[in-house]
Amino acid sequence: MGIVIAVYGKGGIGKSTNSANLSTALAMKGASVLQIGCDPKHDSTFPITGHLQKTVIEVLEEVGFHHEEVMFEDVVKKGFANVDAIEAGGPPAGSGCGGYVVGETVKLLQEFGVYDKYDVILFDVLGDVVCGGFSAPLNYADYALIVATNDFDSIFAANRLCMAIEQKSARSKVQLAGIIGNKVDYVNGGGTNVLDKFADKVNTKVVAKVPMHDLIRRSRLAGKTLFQMEEDGQDVCIAPYLALAEQLLSEKPFATVPKSLGDREIFELMGGWM
């Protein structure tokens, strides 16, 4: 059985872009990879497949939600670097429960036996909400990764995620494999100065520092991974993903049980860090 990774972070922080590029980097290192998008927007795997694929919920609707009539091939698409992609999907905006759909998708994948078919399964999970179905990937994950930027709101959300992972680790095998620092800007944004202090405080570290670079924005608009953008800046943009992929595939990847901070404590600490 391979490793299962769950990627979390504040809404809009860049989880899907980071997940798609990390999945590709893992594949480039020789791993068989399945990425599962767990967001009603169903755009997690867009850079890998180049289009918005049919979601699990759409396939289930077509067969009246009879799981037994769905085949694995009905919900998976092969994308760049032979990365397989699945989108859970969800109800229309303003109705239903996206977390329920994620939970049902996780169950369906278990029925398919996919956890034994890949070297790496990566869940890209909606926002920083880890209740109900959105926490389901943590029940199967070996490792969680948090995507964050060097600002208060992002780090506050990361601390809440550390709380969830800390609690889950008492009942399951999941550990935190570190923080991906996103949109790192050493000129105007302080690099990762605050993020590094936070990581040290909660018993983890920043394991990748993805630069603030226009190539990343343009790759997302183009529906491509950075590995397909053969332009100036590609090397510096893909380097963090390749290094993190190598670390995750190593015999003993870095991983810890986080020691989250209280809400008031993090307010007080970060006021002094800024």
Curated annotation (Swiss-Prot):
- Sites binding [4Fe-4S] cluster sit at C97, C131
The UniProt entry's sequence similarity note says:
Belongs to the NifH/BchL/ChlL family.
Q: Which organism is it from?
A: Chloroherpeton thalassium (strain ATCC 35110 / GB-78)
Q: State the needed cofactors, names only.
A: [4Fe-4S] cluster
Q: Name one Pfam family in it.
A: Fer4_NifH
Catalysis performed (reactions): chlorophyllide a + oxidized 2[4Fe-4S]-[ferredoxin] + 2 ADP + 2 phosphate = protochlorophyllide a + reduced 2[4Fe-4S]-[ferredoxin] + 2 ATP + 2 H2O
In its UniProt entry, what is this protein called? Light-independent protochlorophyllide reductase iron-sulfur ATP-binding protein
> At the top level of its lineage, which domain of life is listed?
Bacteria
Q: Provide the organism lineage as a comma list.
A: Bacteria, Pseudomonadati, Chlorobiota, Chlorobiia, Chlorobiales
Annotated Gene Ontology MF terms?
4 iron, 4 sulfur cluster binding; ATP binding; metal ion binding; oxidoreductase activity, acting on iron-sulfur proteins as donors; oxidoreductase activity, acting on the CH-CH group of donors, iron-sulfur protein as acceptor
Underlying gene: bchL
Into which EC class is this enzyme placed?
Answer: oxidoreductase
- Biological role: Component of the dark-operative protochlorophyllide reductase (DPOR) that uses Mg-ATP and reduced ferredoxin to reduce ring D of protochlorophyllide (Pchlide) to form chlorophyllide a (Chlide). This reaction is light-independent. The L component serves as a unique electron donor to the NB-component of the complex, and binds Mg-ATP.
